[in-house]
């Protein structure tokens, strides 16, 4: 995927607030705080500062939308599950995240991020179950594989895939540091965009 056009469209702070008027399919990226989402997006888009990398996890409070190649809209969702964020703040974010994922008429697919070094948290499982209930096609990007030795990373990816009941084509090992998995993830996005509307498929 060659990035010829990348334009920030704006933020959505509440489920009934502003959202892009552009009628392109949307791909959402979601993961717990500190999973490496900003670094992954920067590498995927081949930009050093496309998504701001914060030193304080849990800072992002809005959904940020970007026009990619006039082909699709990338939705960068707030990180979930950061322990130091107050319960009140989490209570504000959950309706935004779940409301968007459950009601966006143009959502074509979701990429959920997991850190290869850690077992999925309860928040991760809750998100997976929610996405499964909604029925939206989902890819799991397993991040930070460069933090382990290659053999360890492969074994860990296989272990996580089996534990989560994921097929090989649903999982993309990724390193924002080395760029490993960048082309595979870009290809997975194109496959999501080429799929028929999953809502129509569900109705049938």
From Swiss-Prot:
Domain EngB-type G: 23-195
CDD domains given in the database record: YihA_EngB (cd01876)
UniProt keyword annotation of Transmembrane present: no
Binding-site positions, Mg(2+): 38, 60
Protein name: Probable GTP-binding protein EngB
Family, per entry: Belongs to the TRAFAC class TrmE-Era-EngA-EngB-Septin-like GTPase superfamily. EngB GTPase family.
Entry cofactors: Mg(2+)
PANTHER family membership: ENGB-TYPE G DOMAIN-CONTAINING PROTEIN (PTHR11649:SF13), MSS1/TRME-RELATED GTP-BINDING PROTEIN (PTHR11649)
Keyword Nucleotide-binding: yes
Disulfide bond annotation, renumbered to this chain: none
Protein task: Necessary for normal cell division and for the maintenance of normal septation.
Single Gene Ontology BP annotation: division septum assembly
PROSITE patterns per the UniProt record, alphabetical: G_ENGB (PS51706)
């Amino acid at each position: 995927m060659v990035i010829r056009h990348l334009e920030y469209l704006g933020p959505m702070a509440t489920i009934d607030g502003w959202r892009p008027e552009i009628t392109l399919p949307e791909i959402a990226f979601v993961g717990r705080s500190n999973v490496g989402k900003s670094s992954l997006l920067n590498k995927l888009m081949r930009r050093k500062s496309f998504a701001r990398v914060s030193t304080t996890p849990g800072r992002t409070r809005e959904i940020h939308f970007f026009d990619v190649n006039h082909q699709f809209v990338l939705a960068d969702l707030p990180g979930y599950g950061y322990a130091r964020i107050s319960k009140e703040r989490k209570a504000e974010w959950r309706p935004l995240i779940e409301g968007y994922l459950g009601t966006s008429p143009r959502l074509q697919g979701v990429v959920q991020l997991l850190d290869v070094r850690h077992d999925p948290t309860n928040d991760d499982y809750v998100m997976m179950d929610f996405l499964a209930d909604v029925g939206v096609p989902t890819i799991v990007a397993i991040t930070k594989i460069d933090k382990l030795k290659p053999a360890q990373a492969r074994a860990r990816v296989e272990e996580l895939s089996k534990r989560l009941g994921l097929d090989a084509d649903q999982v993309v090992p990724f390193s924002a540091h080395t760029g490993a998995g960048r082309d595979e993830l870009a290809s997975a996005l194109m496959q999501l965009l080429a799929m028929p509307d999953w809502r129509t498929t569900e109705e049938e």
